[in-house]
Amino acid sequence: MRPDGPRDPVAGPDSGPEPPYPVRLSGPVIKGFGRGSKELGIPTANIPAEGLEEYPDLQVGVYYGVVALDPAKFQYQEGQGSTSTSSTGGAEAAVLPAVLSIGYNPFYKNKTKSIEIHIMPPLSSPSPTADGAGEVKFHKLPDFYGTQLKLLILGYIRPEYDYVSLEALIEDIRVDCEVARKSLQRPAYACYIDGDEKECSDVVREQRRWLVTF
């Protein structure tokens, strides 16, 4: 069960990701258990868990990072709060913040390990999961099954927990989203999103180049 007590507002050092992060994972978006949107109201993009074989020491739990989707199949319409699919080539992939779980989800007692990624709106947009924001509506995108997704995991938030109720699980995921947002807003992490040539190190630029190249 989740321990009682307040949550830390950020995760990871302010100076930026430390080994083993960033962790690179990629794959086509596949169908998951079908619970994210329908039961929890929290849409997720699942990718095959086989990529975890490269990282045998990566523990199960909740993480934060950044994602990009193949722009030949999916384009984020920045500034409109919506998304669309497209087959037009030449567009650059949008880099978006994400919170994700790797593991078995003890509340549902899954038998197989999964990677479930919730893609959040740009950090410049109002947070739909902020405390006191009214009714929580997690960020939703149109379906994009089969689209290639790339993920850089930048930090670890917490272990997996079981919960006394579905509502308690949803509330902890809401807090996960806020921890991820606040963590990614720090300059050493924001570079992975905005790619500022003046502020980013060569290492960050190389990681970001991998992220947006399809």
From Swiss-Prot:
Binding annotation for Mg(2+): T44, N46
Tell me one Pfam family matched here.
Flavokinase
Describe the family membership recorded for this protein in Swiss-Prot or TrEMBL.
Belongs to the flavokinase family.
Region spans: Disordered: 1-26
Q: Which chemical reaction does it catalyze?
A: riboflavin + ATP = FMN + ADP + H(+)
Write down how the cofactor binds this protein. Zinc or magnesium.
Please give the organism: Aspergillus fumigatus (strain ATCC MYA-4609 / CBS 101355 / FGSC A1100 / Af293)
The record's annotation in InterPro entries points to: Riboflavin_kinase, Riboflavin_kinase_bac/euk, Riboflavin_kinase_dom_sf
Q: Which GO terms describe its molecular function?
A: ATP binding; metal ion binding; riboflavin kinase activity
Instruction: Provide the alphabetized UniProt keywords.
Output: ATP-binding, Flavoprotein, FMN, Kinase, Magnesium, Metal-binding, Nucleotide-binding, Transferase, Zinc
Q: Where is the active site?
A: E116
Biological process (GO), any one: FMN biosynthetic process
Question: Superkingdom of this entry's organism?
Answer: Eukaryota
Protein name per UniProt: Riboflavin kinase
Its GO CC terms are:
mitochondrion
As for what it does, the entry says: Catalyzes the phosphorylation of riboflavin (vitamin B2) to form flavin mononucleotide (FMN) coenzyme.
